[in-house]
Regions:
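Polytopic alpha-helical membrane proteins, predominantly small-molecule transporters/carriers
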Residues: 1-336
Length: 336
């Protein structure tokens, strides 16, 4: 299997993760004009599962180091498979809420609040499980991310006040916060199933990053029959959606959703592959710089803060500054 052999390359992989995790939401925005997010989400999950399988059979199967994908699956212990599956179930619950929040409140609000909160809690959880890097610099970086989240929250609040507010936006903010709390836990369950210290000569019973990703995506797909079916019948906003409507979508519409799942899956694969050199906490934290990427898309491409006053513009500028400084601290923490 392919293995990252240097911290510098691990950081590059983490930046790719950040771009992927912060950009997949664009596919939802592209499909949202004619396609309910509950239907989009099925394509997203299918794309994620298929791309995880492709990565596992290619990058996860070639090379002289580590264990190839199929051999690794055959020797994995039940406890580690269950841990990765549980990570997929937790992620799916959080991501459905995040997708709903994006549909209600926009990318520039949902991602910084939801994923930013997941970053803070997730770094603490992952560092406690596998300490690596300078904790002082790491948590200074996390504190700066918290400051960025606060700026985003104030900016979105002023936007609502200026526009008279609406119940959908408020509901979207609440959903983003709940999603963030749930999302902070999924990575640890998957990381616990992997041998992060010995990718070249893995411990028996533990998983490679590729096998862990495949099992995670299987957990997402299986749990989607429960979670998304429930949301389709009892949506957060709008009328209930039927499975019959899913099959009325065009091929292009379905492919856009699958692309979103593939983009997220690529980012997650790179995060797990990088964790061997960077450590779970740092790999997770760098990837969760995604809110800044999503906010850039939301502010500059989708114009979600169009018409905002000068004070909102300053808050957004400070938010971006704090995110950049926070990410810099997280990178530095791994070199100490």
């Amino acid at each position: 299997m392919f293995i990252v052999d240097s911290y510098a390359l691990a950081v590059v992989f983490c930046f790719v993760t950040m771009l992927c995790w912060g950009s997949w939401g664009n596919t939802q925005k592209m499909a949202a004009k004619t396609w309910r997010y509950e239907l989009f989400y099925w394509d997203y999950v299918i794309g994620m599962f298929l791309f995880a399988l492709i990565l596992s059979l290619t990058m996860g199967s070639f090379g002289s180091e580590g264990r190839p994908f199929l051999q690794d699956l055959g020797q994995a212990s039940g406890a580690n498979i269950a841990s990765a599956l549980l990570g997929g179930v937790i992620f799916n619950a959080s991501n459905i809420l995040l997708s709903a929040s994006t549909a209600l409140a926009g990318m520039a609000v949902a991602f910084p609040l939801g994923v930013g909160l997941a970053l803070v809690l997730g770094v603490i959880i992952n560092y406690a499980g596998a300490p690596k890097g300078d904790p002082v610099i790491l948590f200074v970086g996390v504190a700066l991310i918290v400051a960025a989240i606060v700026c985003n929250g104030i900016a979105s609040g002023r936007m609502q006040k200026g526009a008279g507010g609406n119940s959908n936006s408020r509901k979207g903010i609440v959903l983003a916060m709940v999603a963030g709390v749930l999302m902070s836990f999924f990575y640890r369950f998957v990381a616990a199933a992997m041998d992060l210290d010995h990718f070249e000569n893995l411990t028996a019973g533990m998983l490679t990053p590729y096998s862990a990703l495949f099992i995670l995506s299987a957990g997402v797909l299986l749990s989607n029959f429960v979670f998304n079916t429930y949301v389709m019948k009892r949506p957060f906003v709008g009328a209930p959606v039927s499975y019959r409507e899913y099959f009325t979508g065009s091929g292009t519409t379905h492919l856009v959703g699958m692309l979103g799942g593939a983009v997220w899956c690529l980012g997650t694969a790179f995060s797990y592959i990088a964790a061997g050199k960077a450590g779970a906490a740092i790999s997770y934290a760098l990837g969760q710089g995604a809110p800044m990427v999503a906010a850039v898309w939301g502010v500059f491409v989708w114009k979600e803060f169009r018409g905002a006053g000068r004070s909102v513009g300053w808050l957004l500028a400070v938010m971006f500054l704090f995110f950049i400084l926070g990410l810099a601290c997280i990178i530095l923490s791994g070199g100490n």
